Design a protein with these regions (language model features):
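Binding-site signature for planar aromatic cofactors or substrates
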Residues: 1-213
Length: 213
């Protein structure tokens, strides 16, 4: 198999033009997100988070969207993690959702800020108990001697809090919200004539433009 021979024709892609867009990019995202869920895509809330560190070196990883409303796009993490340190150094990020079954991706660019403690607490209480214990056990992005060190830390958390809880929200764990300055909706099309429609925020609100593929 040659990697260069792997191609997708996008012959069955639906049409997508400015007239198809919702007035709000957040409404448009919710429409596409629901369609991704309905299409049975595994983890449609998975998104690539791209950051830049203090030396200007880019980094990226997949995280899970946990809320999307007119304020922005929210995910949760350890505030001592590499991504958190990079966000502190350069609080502008990009998110990318890719839904292959629908030939679609969404790219979100904008500033990023921490969610408040009450909001983080409310989300924390919805997490499975073992996920809470895992967050307690993991000093994210820190070097481990071996797997057993992590297993031992998890067992120590179980011994302390039990499997019924409650487990308190750690001080070094919480959420971030990406506040978009632009959101691009990409629809794959035949002959590589893909549709790229962008909402860009200015002083008057959201403006829409089409970009060449």
């Amino acid at each position: 198999m040659s990697i260069s021979d792997l191609r997708q024709s996008y012959d069955d892609a639906p049409s997508f033009d400015v007239g198809d867009l919702a007035d709000s990019p957040f409404d448009q995202f919710r429409q596409w997100f629901k369609q991704a869920v309905d299409a049975g895509i595994m983890e449609p809330n998975a998104m690539t988070l791209a950051t830049v560190d203090g030396a200007g070196r880019p980094d990226a990883r997949v995280v899970l969207l946990k809320d999307a409303d007119d304020r922005g796009f929210t995910f949760y993490t350890n505030y001592g993690s590499a991504k958190a340190r990079q966000i502190n150094a350069h609080p502008e990020v990009t998110l990318v959702f890719y839904w292959d079954v629908l030939f679609r991706q969404v790219r979100v660019r904008g500033a990023i800020t921490k969610v408040d403690r009450n909001e983080a607490e409310a989300y924390w209480r919805t997490r499975p108990i073992k996920s809470q214990l895992g967050a307690i056990a993991s000093s994210q992005s820190q070097t481990l001697k071996d797997r057993q060190q992590l297993e031992d830390a998890f067992q120590a958390a179980v011994d302390k809090y039990g499997l019924e809880g409650p487990v308190p929200l750690p001080n070094d764990w919480g959420g971030y919200r990406v506040i978009p300055s632009s959101i691009e909706f990409w629809q794959g099309q035949r002959s590589r004539l893909h549709d790229r429609l962008v909402y860009a925020r200015d002083a008057e609100g959201w403006q829409v433009k089409r970009l060449a593929p």
